[in-house]
Curated annotation (Swiss-Prot):
Belongs to the RbfA family. This is Ribosome-binding factor A. It comes from Methylococcus capsulatus (strain ATCC 33009 / NCIMB 11132 / Bath). GO terms for biological process: maturation of SSU-rRNA. Transmembrane segments: none annotated. The keyword Cytoplasm applies. Keywords: Cytoplasm, Ribosome biogenesis. HAMAP family: RbfA (MF_00003).
Amino acid sequence: MPREFSRSDRVSAQMQREIAEFLRTGIDAPELGMVTVSDVDVSRDLAVAKVFVTFLGARLETRAAVKRLGEFAPQLRQVLGRRMRMRIIPEIRFAYDDSLERGLHMDEVLRSLNKDGDL
């Protein structure tokens, strides 16, 4: 019987939980505001993890906030190394998740089309 989830999917899910906990309790960076980990995409060979984040109440521009978050990657890898049972912890790369903004934009477009009677 095939497994329901691949190993990379299971690692992604565990990393998402651990990274969210680390960002909530392990860093002192009030300029980032509240950081939400929306997804973690781990490569098939488990070498790289792309962590998608959003910011609420950040005092920095998005790019600067992602760069600032990247400064915590080495410390985060150490924490993950202690908490996860893996021989090698993936390299962590942070990226801003703009899916919410794109969704809101699509909603505005659909509303304007509906208002104009085009839908």
